[in-house]
């Protein structure tokens, strides 16, 4: 069995985490298994389900700049102790560099960098994240993204055109199928009657691009 290590912040109900769980639930777990390397020291919403599916959750030292040497050592120790892990699938915006570099130093043969965004958050950590972003292509063996624009932003156009892979976010369509009784209940609850309703399911964050919807 091949174990794939997913590097994330923690397994709460965010977009990346939900996408991973949608894939995980339908994975052929006789051949592949997901394990999770989390950076935040708090329980995640999906932790119990992960363990029920046979996955393991490992704690990293965190992705603060001062933790970088400890992170590299921790990653090398983890992969030495668990040779069944053959693949790293890294998320975490630009800070995924920590996991990618640690896996590279440990000699892990497959290191997937996954771009989920077309920009970096403009916060106090922006200079550090921008610096880390420049080194991701050299630390990864494979370039994945949710779309072409995100791939070009993280890896550059030439690298993306040569090696990029678009991984569509997995969605369990049965959960969102049309159900007349649910429609009637919600319309009655919110007093919508037969009005035209345009729904948008997303956090109120810049990367969700609500301005395009409003325009």
Q: Model segments located where?
A:
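N-terminal strand-loop element at the rim of the active site
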Residues: 2-70
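Short hydrophobic "strand-cap" motifs at the C-terminus of beta-strands
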Residues: 7-8, 146, 167-170, 200-204
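A conserved mid-protein helix/loop that constitutes part of the nucleotide-sugar donor-binding site
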Residues: 14-22, 196, 200-215
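An amphipathic, basic-hydrophobic alpha-helix
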Residues: 49-56, 61-87, 97-101, 105, ...
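A short helix/loop element that forms part of the nucleotide-sugar donor recognition site in Leloir-type
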Residues: 75-76, 177-191
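Short His-centered aromatic/hydrophobic patch
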Residues: 90-96, 115
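A conserved, positively charged/aromatic
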Residues: 105, 112-146, 157-160
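A short, active-site helix/loop in glycosyltransferases that binds the activated sugar's phosphate group
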Residues: 139-177
